[in-house]
From Swiss-Prot:
The keyword Membrane applies. The keyword Membrane applies. This is Photosystem II reaction center protein X. PSII is composed of 1 copy each of membrane proteins PsbA, PsbB, PsbC, PsbD, PsbE, PsbF, PsbH, PsbI, PsbJ, PsbK, PsbL, PsbM, PsbT, PsbX, PsbY, PsbZ, Psb30/Ycf12, peripheral proteins PsbO, CyanoQ (PsbQ), PsbU, PsbV and a large number of cofactors. It forms dimeric complexes. Involved in the binding and/or turnover of quinones at the Q(B) site of photosystem II (PSII). PSII is a light-driven water plastoquinone oxidoreductase, using light energy to abstract electrons from H(2)O, generating a proton gradient subsequently used for ATP formation. The gene is psbX. It is found in: Cellular thylakoid membrane.
């Protein structure tokens, strides 16, 4: 694997870490704290 390819793959990994993890945490936080009240 060439260094440029390795850097590209690591940039994808860190991009996912920086974007996906905070988004997931935010969605879980919102879903827990802002539950929709449904009448039965």
């Amino acid at each position: 694997m060439t260094p440029s390819l390795a850097n590209f793959l690591w940039s994808l990994v860190w991009g996912a870490v920086i974007v996906v993890i905070p988004a997931t945490v935010a969605l879980i936080f919102i879903s827990v704290n802002d539950q929709i009240k449904r009448s039965q």
